[in-house]
Amino acid sequence: MKKILLLLAFLPLISFAKDKNGVLYDVVITRVKDGDTVAFQATWLPDPLPKELAVRVYGVDTPEKGFRAKCPQEEARGQAATNFTKNAVAKSIKRQVLLMDWDKFGGRVLGDVILDGVSLRQMLIQNGFAREYYGETKQSWCN
């Protein structure tokens, strides 16, 4: 019975994976994890499922920070990308997520964050905080 309830609970999320264009939701962003990942309230999920999901911005690679950074330059760039995303979220009034698919790492979804009608993906690339990335070998941020 629990398995059936969990499956039913996840049906709204599973359905967006079939739509290549994604499904757009108005959200409350709860925190910025790094330059390309934000957490948002997912209050539509029933108990005992978590009420927060993380969305990783699809199609970009931002520098890592902390222990994942491969050099001091990447750490600094990763922190700058995170700060950029935090500032963009803080300045925005209308916050949405475009959910596209499940991420290859459990617990996250892929999509985009739309701030006042503007794609975070586009903002990160245009301002030099991210590179386009679709699963190929990543370029180093250490040069």
Could you describe each region identified by the protein language model?
Residues I4-L13:
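Sec-dependent N-terminal signal peptides
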